[in-house]
Amino acid sequence: MPMSLGNAFIKNFLGKAPDWYKVAIIAFLIINPIVFFFINPFLAGWLLVVEFIFTLAMALKCYPLQPGGLLAIEAIAIGMTSPGQVKHELVANIEVLLLLVFMVAGIYFMKQLLLFIFTKILLGIRSKVLLSIAFSVTAAFLSAFLDALTVIAVIISVAVGFYSIYHKVASGQSVHSSHDHTHDEGISELTRDDLENYRAFLRSLLMHAGVGTALGGVTTMVGEPQNLIIADQAGWQFGEFLLRMAPVTVPVFIAGMLTCMLVEKFRIFGYGARLPANVRQILLDFDSEERKNRTNQDVAKLWVQGAIAVWLIVGLALHLAAVGLIGLSVIILATAFTGVIEEHSLGKAFEEALPFTALLAVFFSIVAVIIDQELFKPVIDAVLNVEDHGTQLALFYVANGLLSMVSDNVFVGTVYITEVKTALMEGMISRDQFDLLAVAINTGTNLPSVATPNGQAAFLFLLTSALAPLIRLSYGRMVIMAFPYTLALSLVGFIGIMFLLEPMTEVFYSLGWISHHVAPAADALLQSGH
């Protein structure tokens, strides 16, 4: 019997998502305007934030762009925020959007080099604990100079490469044949266990690398977008930023590495999976096959990609241009010198990042609602009104941490540093206290935010990437795997803020490594358009 038109509409709405999910989204769309107009706009704002987090948590059931986008469109339509405010948010975050469009695509054209390097690391280090630390330290080092999103894009691209090599062979095909690695039909029962173990192995490496990006990203002013904003407001240069953060970031880095060792050693929270012997053999065969078949043309491509990688790191570390523009230069150089000149070959590179770029634009419209409805204002006001300096520092760290777990850490960091700058201008706090608070804000937004994918853009990118469903990495699983790290980083960060920050900063002053800033200088900074 043919389907009625009404049923066809319902069937088409959100496609293959489960029926209960469709009902939930429709219920949200009905409830929100009622709460906004008849109960309380503030409550409606928080309801929207919770609903948006729900769509992120269900990313494996349905990509969050559609349900989240519907909620955002309705929020703008009923006046929770305005298209102007959304545009303002997008303009303010244009660097992040450019980064996603161009940098992630640029990394795609450096795949051969990345697979070459990481295959050597993966096959060279037998111990899983050492391998995990190697991934974490590499990610931390890279994200101290590059953006965390770029680093995660690199690691995702490597993991997809590893996954598809094994999947092809396990499905009974040759390594170089074209193959769809999203379907498991061709895999025999014997290799299915290996595949599950391999998925768990890749999951754990990706989570170690993801946390590594947070550990490295907090240390320097170029590590995360909000670090740049905070450094700009405080008038700090690269070296001063590094030193002022060190009393908190160094102990936290050590705690992160210890956590990495412990979860692998005791195989807890979903870690500890080893590389199955069969998979290792397939990767070894692939490596020797690649070596045998490598022509001079392939070697030339690797050299070109190596040179571009050097340009990428130098360009980003010295901030020679906006991150996205450096990404565009990578696309141009890599394609020109490796001979990729057809339009359809270029298109593939953009497939990974553009859905996420659209999702991020929706995310910024939710941020616009948070700003217009002043959802964080009660928390900020309460913290600013605390008299005791030490308590104020600790509370700033905690409040930032909690808000960064629900909202984007770039947004939280920006809101807080702006409010604190205003307090400094109005003479509510001294310049020295402002400098200490800036450290509390930076560490508070960067460290506890590893708890959930909505806190760190890099985690969100990983969760919504094409790789996540392949290795069965869901929102819930990410939260569980991040938990030991969240606990260790948040607690050690808190101890650093409470007991190490002030005495160590005084030591740095007395050694002459950093100098006291004066409030008028900050004033001049504001007037000069910062």
UniProtKB/Swiss-Prot annotation:
Transmembrane segments: 23-43, 45-65, 90-110, 113-133, 140-160, 205-225, 238-258, 308-328, 351-371, 451-471, 479-499
Membrane-topology annotation of the record: Multi-pass membrane protein
UniProt GO MF annotations: sodium:proton antiporter activity
Domain of life from the UniProt record: Bacteria
Compartments, as annotated in UniProt: Cell inner membrane
Key words of the record: Antiport, Cell inner membrane, Cell membrane, Ion transport, Membrane, Sodium, Sodium transport, Transmembrane, Transmembrane helix, Transport
InterPro entries to which the protein is assigned, alphabetical: Na+/H+_antiporter_NhaB
UniProt entry tagged with the keyword Transmembrane: yes
Bridged cysteine pairs (disulfide): none
Family recorded in the similarity comment: Belongs to the NhaB Na(+)/H(+) (TC 2.A.34) antiporter family.
PANTHER family: NA(+)_H(+) ANTIPORTER NHAB (PTHR43302:SF1), TRANSPORTER ARSB-RELATED (PTHR43302)
Protein name: Na(+)/H(+) antiporter NhaB
